[in-house]
Amino acid sequence: MSRIGKLPITIPENVDINYNDSEITVKGKFGTLQTQIPTVIKITESDNILTVGLSEQTRSVRALHGLYRTLINNMVIGVSEQFEIILELKGVGYRAAVQNNEIILNLGYSHPVNIKIPNIISVEVVQNTTINLKSCDKELLGLFAANIRAWRQPEPYKGKGILYKGEQIIRKAGKSAK
């Protein structure tokens, strides 16, 4: 039995969960999330505690146990508390702004970079160099943050680029003179 899969999921009071054999829907104050689940995953609910079980014990099914328990737990946390990722822009002239449901990045290219913001994600720019991303969907939030970061990944010589908050860049020494 999976160590993560056997852990119970506590459901907050303001979260509503509906499920059948192939789908689970989680509603809360920050939104509604829905995902498909395999029919071999069995969900039971009692006293605001959700447990994820298996209908058969084959190797491939046991591999899904912890995965779907974590996905459901992330949905519950997301609709009740939201997830947040903070990106920092480091570099001369690197700036960010939000305009018309797009984030506009000046990253040293000859043109500004425009990235469309998904509906489920809220973006706030603080002091032109810090981007706060919030969403109830952890997977989509991580993908969007990685998409923004891919435009200027941090480089090891000067430390310029787009960094996650708290990320440490391992610096390299430049060329040494003879």
From Swiss-Prot:
GO biological process: translation
Cysteines engaged in disulfide bonds, as pairs: none
Keyword DNA-binding on entry: no
Broad class of the protein's primary localization: plastid
InterPro entries: Ribosomal_uL6-like (IPR000702), Ribosomal_uL6-like_a/b-dom_sf (IPR036789), Ribosomal_uL6_a/b-dom (IPR020040), Ribosomal_uL6_bac-type (IPR019906), Ribosomal_uL6_CS (IPR002358)
GO cellular component: chloroplast; ribonucleoprotein complex; ribosome
Subcellular location as annotated: Plastid, Chloroplast
Pfam families: Ribosomal_L6 (PF00347)
Single annotated GO MF: structural constituent of ribosome
Key words, A-Z: Chloroplast, Plastid, Ribonucleoprotein, Ribosomal protein, RNA-binding, rRNA-binding
Top-level taxon: Eukaryota
Subunit and interaction comment: Part of the 50S ribosomal subunit.
Task of the protein: Binds 23S rRNA.
Family classification: Belongs to the universal ribosomal protein uL6 family.
Protein name per UniProt: Large ribosomal subunit protein uL6c
Organism this protein belongs to: Phaeodactylum tricornutum (strain CCAP 1055/1)
